[in-house]
Amino acid sequence: MFARLFAPTVEVHAHCDLPCGVYDPAQARIEAESVKAIIGKLADNDDPDFRTRAVIIKEQRSELVKHHLWVLWTDYFKPPHFEKYPQLHTLFNEATKLAGAAGTKGKSSVDDADQLLAKIEEISKIFWETKQA
C-alpha cells in the first residue's frame, strides 16, 4: 500500500472526458423539442396549476439545453475545430442565449424555440462533420 502512495506519478492527457462517443448534440435538440412542445401546451391551457407546472418544466428543460450545449462547446470542440469553423463560438453563444432568460427559459415564444432548434441543427451539422474527420 505504501509503495503505491510513494510511487512516481504519471501524467496523462485526454482529449475529452471519455472517448468522444459520449458527446451528441441530440441531447440538446431533444430538450429543445420538449421546450417547444411545452410552449404549445401552455398556449392551449388556462388552468393555473397546469401552467405553473409547465413553466417550471420549460425552465428546467431550457437549462438542460444550455448544459448540453456548454458541454459540447467546452469539452468536445477544440481549437482546431474553432479554426475550421470560426462561426462556432457565435453559434453556441446565440444558442445558449436563446435557451436562457431572454429566450425560451424566460419567455414562451414558439419563434424563440424554432430559432433555438435551428441553431442546434447548425451546431449538429458541424459536430457530425468533425466526427467524420
Please place each PLM-identified region on the residue numbering.
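Short, mixed-charge, low-aromatic patches
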Residues: 48-56, 73-76
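Short, solvent-exposed, charged loop/turn and helix-capping segments
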Residues: 68-85
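Alpha-helical segments in soluble extracytoplasmic regions
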Residues: 53-69
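N-terminal intrinsically disordered, cationic/polar leader segments
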Residues: 1-51, 81, 86-122, 126, ...
